[in-house]
Amino acid sequence: MAVKKDKPRSIFDDYETSIELEKDGAWVTTSRGYEFKIARIGEMNPEYRSYMIECGKLIHAEIEALEEKVGEKNSECDVKKLDDLAAKMDAVTTEAFARYILKGWRKLYDREGKEIPYSVDNAITLMQMHDLYGELYVLARQYSTFLVSNLETTAKN
């Protein structure tokens, strides 16, 4: 009787990502058990990148102008404006994620027990929960979320 030899582990199983999952989204489960469909953050998502670049340029120009002013006078009002612009950039980042990375969810309920339908507006609202946004952001950056070997799992869902 011949002993069946296991094939060696493939590097492709460990590192090859799916362009389909990166663009259209992969289903992930948060640490609290909620299911979201997220696309990958990066060059494969040109809408996200363009939105971030355009909004970022405008805010960056405002920040540079204020930094020059702050360096001259060190006005508390100008420092507050810089803080406001930093908060504005955070809001832009969160909105970009909600619009272009978060593709859907399943079985999310509001406080009254009503299912929350997927929409960009609802996504923007949900991403205001910074811990949820932070957890999904990390998953959207990880290559392992989008492995080709995950295609079967995503197809079943």
Residue ranges and their predicted role:
Residues 1-70, 147-157:
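Short, charged/polar N-terminal "headpieces" of proteins
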Residues 35, 93-106:
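Extended, compositionally biased low-complexity polar/Lys-Gly-rich tracts
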Residues 38, 42, 46, 88, ...:
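Charge-dense, low-complexity intrinsically disordered segments
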Residues 61-78, 103, 107-116:
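Short acidic, glycine/tyrosine-flanked loop/strand segments centered on an H-E-D-like triad
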Residues 76-96:
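Intrinsically disordered, low-complexity acidic Ser/Thr-rich regulatory segments
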Residues 100-157:
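C-terminal charged interaction modules
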